[in-house]
């Protein structure tokens, strides 16, 4: 399954969850899109598991193949499988670019990475799924600092996560792996583990 390129607002309304983490999608209509969007549908256990998986997958904007591969990689790490899965997703380069505030959305962050605007430890990395380790630095190429999407993001109101830092010279750092209580509080990763282990 390829990466979804349609309206994330419709996805958010269908899932009743803000995949952009802003909540804006649900302000106007907090129900699904379409003629029957307001009808309540009773979900089975499988339905709840699938819905939770979709909420997380659309939040990070990854394909099903990448999502499953990351899930399988998490099973090889020490720790609780579901939590390690979330940590791996949170450690993606495109996500850290977003968490640093270089982009207003993960889609914009992915574009910055793919187009070669991002340096990791001083070297260009154009792979959005590149997994960062604590201590690595993330910066913009000098000529990329003046891009409109970068300037708009840097000038917007933004609460930076505690596990990343950014100095006045726009040198970002992935300080440490995040604790589970620091991000995505409305995601129940255990349901996703159950979905893939069914």
From Swiss-Prot:
Q: Lineage of the native species?
A: Bacteria, Bacillati, Mycoplasmatota, Mollicutes, Acholeplasmatales
Read off the InterPro entries from this record.
Answer: Ribosomal_uS4, Ribosomal_uS4_bac-type, Ribosomal_uS4_CS, Ribosomal_uS4_N, S4_RNA-bd, S4_RNA-bd_sf
Q: Which NCBIfam families match?
A: PRK05327.1, rpsD_bact
Q: Which Pfam families match?
A: Ribosomal_S4 (PF00163), S4 (PF01479)
Subunit-structure text: Part of the 30S ribosomal subunit. Contacts protein S5. The interaction surface between S4 and S5 is involved in control of translational fidelity.
The protein's superkingdom reads Bacteria
Which family is annotated? Answer: Belongs to the universal ribosomal protein uS4 family.
In terms of HAMAP family, this protein maps to: Ribosomal_uS4_B
Q: What is this protein called?
A: Small ribosomal subunit protein uS4
Q: Where is the S4 RNA-binding domain?
A: 91-154
Query: What is this protein's function?
Result: One of the primary rRNA binding proteins, it binds directly to 16S rRNA where it nucleates assembly of the body of the 30S subunit. With S5 and S12 plays an important role in translational accuracy.
* GO molecular function annotation: rRNA binding; structural constituent of ribosome
List the GO terms this entry assigns under cellular component, sorted alphabetically: small ribosomal subunit
Biological process annotations from GO: ribosomal small subunit biogenesis; translation
Q: Which CDD domains match?
A: S4
User: What species was this sequence derived from?
Assistant: Aster yellows witches'-broom phytoplasma (strain AYWB)
**What are the alphabetically sorted keywords of the record?**
Ribonucleoprotein, Ribosomal protein, RNA-binding, rRNA-binding
């Amino acid at each position: 399954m390829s990466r979804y390129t349609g309206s994330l607002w419709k996805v958010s309304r269908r899932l009743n969850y803000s995949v952009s983490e802003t909540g804006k999608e649900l302000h106007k209509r907090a129900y699904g899109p379409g003629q029957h969007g307001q009808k309540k549908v009773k979900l089975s256990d499988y339905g709840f598991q699938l819905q939770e998986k979709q909420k997380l997958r659309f939040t990070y904007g990854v394909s099903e193949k990448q999502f499953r591969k990351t899930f399988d990689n998490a099973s090889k790490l020490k720790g609780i499988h579901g939590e390690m899965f979330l940590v791996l997703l949170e450690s993606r380069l495109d996500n850290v670019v977003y968490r640093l505030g270089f982009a207003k959305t993960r889609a914009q962050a992915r574009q910055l990475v793919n187009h070669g605007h991002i340096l990791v430890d001083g070297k260009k990395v154009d792979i959005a799924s590149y997994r960062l380790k604590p201590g690595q630095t993330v910066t913009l190429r000098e000529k990329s600092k003046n891009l409109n999407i970068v300037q708009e993001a840097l000038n917007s109101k933004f609460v930076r996560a505690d596990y990343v830092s950014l100095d006045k010279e726009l040198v970002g750092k992935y300080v440490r792996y995040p604790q589970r209580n620091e991000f995505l509080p409305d995601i129940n990763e255990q349901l996703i583990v159950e979905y893939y282990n069914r």
